[in-house]
């Protein structure tokens, strides 16, 4: 009888923890993805040290003295193939 009570209490505890857990904390959460986009630079915007990082892991190209850095398109995008 004592074992059944312990199992019941454990089950109720796990159910309560499951209900109280954050509903969608996955890295693909749309709110997190949208927040990341707000913190990144689009194509041909400034990027690099002191600026935002490039969206969609685009390359951040700088001139020879490492200033005037901008986000560039992927090579495949230049030919119209997408990412």
Swiss-Prot record:
Please describe the organ and tissue distribution of this protein's expression: Expressed by the venom gland.
Keyword Secreted present in the record's keywords: the answer is yes
The record's subcellular locations are: Secreted
Quick check: keyword Metal-binding in the entry? Answer: no
Q: Which CDD domains match?
A: Spider_toxin
What residues form the membrane-spanning segments?
Answer: none
Where does the record locate the signal sequence feature?
1-21
The chain's coiled-coil residues are: none
Q: Which GO terms describe its molecular function?
A: calcium channel regulator activity; ion channel inhibitor activity; toxin activity
- What is known about what this protein does? Antagonist of L-type calcium channels (Cav1/CACNA1). In GH3 neuroendocrinal cell line, it reversibly inhibits the A-type potassium current but does not block other potassium currents or calcium channels. Shows an important acetylcholine-mediated antiarrhythmogenic effect in isolated hearts. In vivo, causes paralysis in the posterior limbs and gradual decreases in movement and aggression during 24 hours at dose levels of 5 ug per mouse.
Protein name, UniProt field: Kappa-ctenitoxin-Pn1a
- Species source reads Phoneutria nigriventer (Brazilian armed spider)
